[in-house]
């Protein structure tokens, strides 16, 4: 017969006879692993043997045939031959390796972070071509623009539409018909007729007068999203822009030349007038711009050094550049994608915390969620079933408390699908609104060349994205509320059974004490930021614009909420991994063990107090790079497919189906295998 033997994080298959003793099997297992892994500091001896199922202790004098069956899984806790110097050297090596990995993460982040970029820098060339047609742009496309991955180009159909609209508009202007913003003033001045010789001056004055924003500028990579989205709206062919000017805008985008755009100053109605005016101002050669070759410089200098021509405005073209909801929508699309990523990873992090806290998976039984068929709830429950203990995906930690008397867990563990689920559903609701807005003509007036009409309307009103982003902030904030409470359970000895603040020498060391305090402060800030911006309205423009959306702040604070949520979940993830140190040699399921290993690449176990912020930041950057999700995705896809074929596959205490997914370090070594790469 054969037994599968776990020693630390390694696994070996050991042949044995029915009349062998447990002691003989344990000795043989240690000898085999020492031969296959000569660098492991294993002693010749071991100190206990346990069955994986139930974590029950085995008597070394028992015969194998009396207590085990063929192919059973056992755990041998072996002694480690390490001097104190070797232990210290190992700790230092882990810290040094983590610092090197943190430096790599910082370097990746700097490549797309230009907030403080005053000097020239080298950027990687774009790897994708994005065709803009005004109808098919997606939020993830804008994020690719933000990362510098895309160059853009107009579709041929869009160019035709733009030409037709411009030809018709120039005809209207030449006939000097009374058309708002073409031959009249703006807002309260809409009753003022402008003489033909001043129509171009009217548009230039509009840009200059409306560029009155306040506050810190958008980072160049985010201003680039704003530019790409405005080009996409102009590509619909209802704005009246000329093909020549839109091609100049595309050339500026592809050269990574972007204007100085203050973040504050829009009320989200009549479009995002202030920020879009700043965007246009730089393209006219006024104000400031940024490019990789110049850093921040006067706009005319930046354009000249990049061989770009400034825009030359004809009738209505100034209004076409600034009348729209693109500031709210571009930031909203970016925030939406980050919310989508953190919501998925929140399911993974919650699963790891539940295993460390020795919670039960029974609350995720498919029948519970089938009779409350919210899509997000069922999706979250499925992920938790796939990540956590089942016969198909075993966790030694879960097996160790199979026979405990606990009936149910606290809400932040038991109700993860119900709370995370509504976040998933809210994100998809917001995605529909934002995607529609990204491909909508939001000018005023709008040019309908086929009808030969120019019609004034209200598509510039930002209520749709404003309300959606307020809703998004409210929903996503719940992820941090749940996470911070799980973090509290992890650091609280009375709730977790783990050492207080997850430190082995409390008193001398404070461990994760203030990590939880920081998380609590961010959750508290989010509660204030979740007050909806869009419930407010202050009339503007002499009461002509008497209801506004306040969407600009809705977008900015939604992004801040998401950033706080990412940070809180990074802290929970670090704490959950620290909790595992006190459960060793037991390990979690294969996908969750992979997350543990990923975190340990930048954050070694906290054996004594040290400066933790670089490690928190590194784990946070991993979350922002979506690496937690990407690490478990192959496992999720396989295990979820198993449940689709067999609804009982991921239930607790079920028969093991085929297709077990295991981390490479957990795959048993065959008798004739001499090494593991």
From Swiss-Prot:
Q: Which Gene3D superfamilies match?
A: Fumarase/aspartase (Central domain), Fumarase/aspartase (N-terminal domain), Phosphatidylinositol 3-kinase Catalytic Subunit, Chain A, domain 1
The metabolic or biological pathway listed in the UniProt record of this protein is:
Amino-acid degradation; L-histidine degradation into L-glutamate; N-formimidoyl-L-glutamate from L-histidine: step 1/3
Which parts of the sequence carry 2,3-didehydroalanine (Ser)?
Answer: 270
Write out the PTM section of this UniProt entry.
Contains an active site 4-methylidene-imidazol-5-one (MIO), which is formed autocatalytically by cyclization and dehydration of residues Cys-Ser-Gly.
Chain residue numbers at which the record places covalent cross-link 5-imidazolinone (Cys-Gly): 269-271
Q: Which domain of life is it from?
A: Eukaryota
Q: Cite the EC number.
A: 4.3.1.3
Q: Name one GO cellular component term.
A: cytoplasm
Catalyses which reaction?
Answer: L-histidine = trans-urocanate + NH4(+)
Q: Which CDD domains match?
A: PAL-HAL
Q: Which UniProt keywords apply?
A: Histidine metabolism, Lyase
* Protein name per the record: Histidine ammonia-lyase
- This chain's source organism reads Caenorhabditis elegans
Gene name on record?
haly-1
């Amino acid at each position: 017969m054969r037994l599968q033997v776990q020693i630390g994080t390694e696994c070996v298959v050991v042949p044995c006879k029915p009349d062998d003793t447990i002691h003989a099997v344990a000795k043989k297992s240690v000898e085999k692993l020492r031969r296959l892994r000569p660098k492991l500091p294993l002693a010749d001896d071991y100190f206990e043997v346990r069955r994986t199922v139930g974590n029950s202790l085995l008597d070394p004098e028992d015969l194998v045939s009396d207590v085990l069956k063929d192919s059973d899984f056992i755990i041998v806790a072996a002694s480690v031959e390490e001097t104190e110097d070797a232990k210290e050297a190992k700790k230092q090596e882990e810290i040094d390796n983590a610092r090197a990995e943190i430096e790599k993460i910082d370097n990746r982040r700097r490549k797309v972070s230009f907030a403080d970029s005053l000097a020239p820098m080298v950027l990687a060339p774009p790897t994708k071509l994005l065709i803009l047609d005004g109808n098919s742009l997606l939020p993830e496309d804008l994020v690719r623009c933000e990362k510098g991955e895309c160059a853009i180009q107009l579709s041929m159909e869009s160019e035709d539409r733009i030409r037709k609209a411009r030809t018709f508009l120039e005809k209207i202007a030449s006939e000097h018909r009374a058309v708002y913003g073409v031959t009249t003033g703006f807002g309260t001045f809409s009753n003022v007729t402008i003489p033909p010789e001043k129509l171009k001056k009217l548009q230039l004055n509009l840009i200059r007068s409306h560029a009155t924003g306040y506050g810190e500028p958008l980072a160049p990579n985010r201003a680039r999203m704003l530019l790409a989205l405005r080009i996409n709206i102009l590509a619909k062919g209802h704005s009246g822009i000329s093909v020549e000017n839109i091609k100049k805008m595309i050339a500026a985008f592809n050269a990574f030349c972007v204007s100085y755009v203050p973040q504050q100053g829009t009320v989200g109605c009549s479009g995002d007038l202030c920020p879009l005016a700043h965007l246009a101002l730089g393209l006219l050669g006024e104000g400031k711009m940024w490019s990789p070759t110049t850093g921040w410089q006067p706009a005319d200098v930046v354009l000249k050094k990049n061989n770009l021509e400034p825009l030359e405005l004809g009738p209505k073209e100034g209004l076409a550049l600034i009348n729209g909801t693109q500031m709210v929508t571009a930031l909203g699309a970016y925030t939406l994608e980050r919310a989508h990523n953190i919501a998925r990873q929140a399911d993974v992090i919650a699963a790891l915390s539940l295993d460390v806290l020795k919670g039960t998976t029974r609350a995720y039984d498919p029948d519970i969620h089938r009779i409350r068929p919210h899509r997000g709830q069922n999706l979250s429950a499925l992920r938790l079933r796939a990540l956590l203990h089942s016969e198909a995906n075993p966790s030694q930690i879960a097996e160790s408390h199979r026979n405990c008397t606990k009936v149910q867990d606290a809400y932040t563990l038991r109700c993860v699908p119900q709370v995370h689920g509504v976040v998933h559903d809210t994100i998809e609701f917001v995605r529909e609104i934002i995607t529609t807005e990204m491909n909508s003509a939001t000018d005023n007036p709008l040019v309908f060349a086929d009808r030969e009409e120019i019609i004034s309307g209200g598509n510039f009103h930002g209520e749709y994205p404003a309300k959606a982003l307020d809703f998004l902030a409210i929903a996503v904030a719940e992820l941090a509320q749940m996470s911070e409470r799980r973090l509290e359970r992890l650091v609280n000895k009375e709730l977790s059974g783990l050492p207080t603040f997850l430190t082995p020498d409390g008193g001398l060391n404070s461990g994760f004490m203030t990590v939880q305090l920081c998380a609590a402060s961010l959750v508290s800030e989010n509660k204030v930021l979740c007050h909806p911006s869009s419930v407010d309205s202050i009339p503007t423009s002499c009461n002509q614009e008497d209801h506004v959306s306040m969407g600009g702040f809705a977008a900015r604070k939604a992004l801040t909420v998401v950033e706080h949520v990412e940070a809180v979940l990074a802290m929970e993830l670090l704490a959950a991994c620290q909790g595992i140190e006190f459960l060793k040699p037991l390990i979690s399921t294969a996908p969750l063990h992979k997350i543990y290993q990923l975190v340990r690449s930048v954050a070694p176990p906290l054996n004594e107090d040290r400066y933790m912020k670089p490690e928190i930041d590194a784990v946070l950057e991993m979350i922002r790079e979506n690496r937690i999700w990407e690490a478990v995705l192959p496992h999720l896809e396989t295990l979820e497919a198993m449940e689709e074929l067999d609804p009982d596959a991921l239930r607790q205490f079920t028969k093991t189906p085929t297709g077990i997914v295991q981390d490479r370090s957990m795959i048993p070594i065959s008798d004739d295998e001499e090494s593991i790469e």
